[in-house]
Amino acid sequence: MTRGQFRAFVKETGHRTEPETDGQGAWGYDEDTKKIEGRKPKYSWRSTGFAQTEEHPVVNVTWNDANAFCRWLAQRSKRPIRLPTEAEWEYAARAGSAMRFYSGESPETLVKVGNVADGTAKKKFPDWQTTIAEDGYVFTAPVGQFLPNRLGLHDMLGNVWEWCQDWLGPYGDLSAKDPVRNEENQVRLMRGGGWGKRVPQISSSALRFSGAPPSRDMDVGFRVAFRAD
């Protein structure tokens, strides 16, 4: 979801994100020190330390904040909107492809479909090991700037990690149809990788990360899902 969409939610509901209310703040980039900083009250979804327009993905929101947005949008749109399950997310990311990477067989093809740590980022962070390609974005890119997958979905890899509904656990031994783990008080899954991940770290659509529901970061956002009519 974009900053503009999240701002509309905040304006209508008065919602304040956990980084804004718990006193811990969020992650951000300090232009003076040229460094990424851990949680500080001066950072939130509103202020990340790097330039973002309303078309950039919202970041520094927790799993709880993302679910609050989903409840609001579901009520407003009269649709059962929620965070995607991990199974739904991976199906959407792979888009029916049997290749190692949904963009092709080579990890270098990912620069065409996702905002990853590349030559542009290396100019800002010389110590980073990156690809030589340059996409023009050090941090987040506006939503939809890269090629879509076969389902017409943009940014399924790169740009921001995306919260899923599930909690993190090992895959089962048996096949299952849309499995979901949704118990309370468990670490929650994130999928997709963010702008700071490099090839080959981000090279597989199976890449997983996790965090407690109140976790927040400058490369973590979300998308929503609903059942088609």
Please place each PLM-identified region on the residue numbering.
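Acidic-aromatic/histidine active-site loop/patch
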Residues: 2
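Catalytic-histidine neighborhood of serine endopeptidases
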Residues: 11
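Short, structured beta-strand segments at or near domain termini in extracellular proteins/domains
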Residues: 218-229
